[in-house]
Each structure stands twice: as structure tokens, then as C-alpha cells.
């Protein structure tokens, strides 16, 4: 490393940062192909087997609990593991389970199989957190995270359209088989493309490469004990816990829309399944711009994620509230509302992860973001069976009250971080 000229180091950094970014963004979008395909298949599966909303919510909630803990423990592993093995391996195993799901029948099978799928899905994002914090300096990470975060929306939008088309023309089982085959191929491509930290490639740490970036404290470096890092930067760090609890409520809104929107739009608003897929794609695609805008604005504000998150959450509350007043048949209006909700929910969803990484430093970043994911998907668990129960007993407005009140609580928690900036 010491023999390389500054020009050579700069060239290699630019090459590897570009390769890491497009690889993990594409890779995580593929993860969505074998996780969110179930949303478009929900109604035909429920119709074929006679499931109630509560029973289908159980499929979603059990799998979400598994995903929450898988993501957390994968985060603990991700701070020490090579990202290429963890991310590519998880995608391959998830794809194989999707193939199996397509042959299934019965509530018990669907619960067990989708829970297994979500166990492997938890390996998708923690490697990305490690790569982001090791390849991009704190001054760049808001924008870099926003670019990577587009993988959520790209994957979600594409699978909503593709799975909707597959269900319409070939039946719900095709919505699991076709994405699975693509992701099997994608897992080997991902293994080839990904790398580890700059130091593993013979390059200096990003703090050294980017002039003016803060140095990491020596006692928190890679050689520090796992328990020491976890205790200092996560367990006793109140700010990581605040944003993690806020994520619990943000995910009730986000996952509620992702998992239940197709069913809601068809049953309550008179949409076809194909039109519902377009509305969900609008939600996802607008989220790309919401996350990019939130990251750029917060970087311009010196790393203050709190004010930007609160602004977005207030507008999210207003957007969800509009759903109460839109009559059935107003497809363009509903598409506009879904576009607004996507923009405003994905901004704070992304900033929560960035803030947790900021507060925990890069050597505990995957663990910290894993904690936000754990709390977030516990919220999604509440949303799964909770939405089903509310819809069965109070209609779809009951679910909207759950989402709007959750957005209010999440906004209040993020307001507590208003003046908090990253830890150097």
C-alpha cells in the first residue's frame, strides 16, 4: 500500500467504489425479488385456499419476526465477515426456498416456508452497511447511502410489476419460480463482483484517503473485542436506541403499504391487480428520490439527520391522512397519494440507518443498523397480523388509523435527535 502513488490510490479507490456501489445496489434489489413477490400473490393465494386476512397476516408476521432477528444477528456477523460470502450466500438460499414455496399448499406450509425464506433474507443488507461505512467517508455517506437505498425501491417497483404480470398470465406460483431462477444466477454474479474493505484490497482506510475526514479512535478499531464494541457503541448508546425505536413505527407504515396495498386497492378502491401493481411501483420509485433528497439535504446540513427526518415525517402523516378521503375509482388521485407516501417514508427510513451508523462509528455500523432493522421489522410484525385483525373487524380505515398514528409517534421520536450530529 505504501508503494502506491496518490494517483494510483485515487484511481483504485474510484474503481472499487463504483464497483462496490453498483454490485451491492443490484444485489439488494435482487433480494426484493424473492421477498416482496409475495405481496402481489397475496390475494390469489388467499382466494385459492380460503384464508382470512388474519390468517394471511399470520404468514407475514411470523416471517417478519424471523427476518427481524436474522437481520440483527447478520448485522453482528456483518461487522466481521466478508460481505461477498454473506450477501451472495443469503441470496442463493432465499432463491432456493422461493422455488420450494411455489410448490406449496396449506397455511402451515406457507408460514414455515416463508419464515425460512426470511431467515436467509436477513443476510442481504448488513454486508452493504459494512461496505458503505468502509468505502465512503462520513462527509459522503448520506449521499452514498441514498444511492444504495434506491435498491429498495428499484427492487420493489420491478417485482411489483413483474410479479403482477406473472400472476395475471401464469398464476401465483410463477411469481415465485421465475424470480428465484433469476436470483440463483444473480447470486453467483454477486459473489464475483463484491469485495471487502479498502484495507483488504491493499488501500488506505477511507479516513486517510479523503482529506479532512475524521479519524477513527484506535480503541474501537477492527481489533477491538466484539463485546467491547457492542457495549460501547450500541448497548449503552441512547441515540442508537432512539432511532431504532422510531424505526419500529416507520416500518409499520412502510411495510404496511408494501404488504397490504395490492389487497387494499383491489378490495377497497376498485383497482385491478395490474393497476395496483402500478400504484405500488409509483410508491417505490418515488422513494428513490425521497431517499436521495433526504441524504443530500442532511449532508448539506452537516450530518444533522434529525431535522430532515422530522420534515419528511410530517409530510408523510399528511399523505397517509389523505387516504381517508379518497373515494373508490379515483385511480390517478390514489397513484399521486402513493407517490407522495413513497417519497416521504423512504427519506426517514434511510436516514434512521445513516444516523445509527453515524452514532456508532464505522466499526459497529452493521450491528447498529442491524438493531434498527430488528426494531423496524418487529414493527412490521405488528403491522402484519395487526392489519389483518383491524381490517377483519373495522374495515380498511382501521388499518389507516394504525399507519397514521404510527407515523405521528415516529415523528415525535425523531424530533429528539434534532440537534444530534455524527460521532467521529
Write out the residue ranges for each language-model feature.
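C-terminal transmembrane helical hairpin of 12-TM major facilitator-type secondary transporters
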Residues: 304-355
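Conserved MFS/SLC helix-loop-helix module at the cytosolic interface between two early adjacent transmembrane helices
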Residues: 69-108
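Cytoplasmic membrane-interface "Motif A"-like loop-to-helix N-cap segments
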Residues: 80-91, 299-313
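Extracytoplasmic gate region of multi-pass secondary transporters
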Residues: 38-40, 236-292, 349, 383-384
